[in-house]
Amino acid sequence: MTKAEEYVAAWRLGYRGDFSLVDRIYHPDYKSFDYRTGIEANLEDDKVITSTLNAVMTIGHFQTIYESEDFLGVECFVKRNYAEIDGSDPDYAARITAVHYENGKIIAQKTSTNPLDFDPSEYFEWKWEDFE
């Protein structure tokens, strides 16, 4: 399994509340600044943030941008569905995550989220339903 496949599999399980693979691939000293919350997050913080936000988000297709022994770059698409909260239509974003490794474990990562004014599933060969 590649680093990208392992990363995606770990977080897909995490989105469902199973963080066992996440725990195995992250370094105990992992830290990351979370721009959504404004905090320097450790792994436990990331789990809480993910669990909370996943209630209104669908994480779609992932694509590997770059992978080496010490670095992974991945892109994914996100559908944010606030209809149950405020009745609004879903919106979409593209995320790029840079993942840094130390001794084979994830030590740091940064995610940049870019809003989209279109539904990416209409332009690519996948459907949101495949990821819900």
Regions of interest found by a model, annotated:
Residues 1-132:
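C-terminal and inter-domain tail/linker signature
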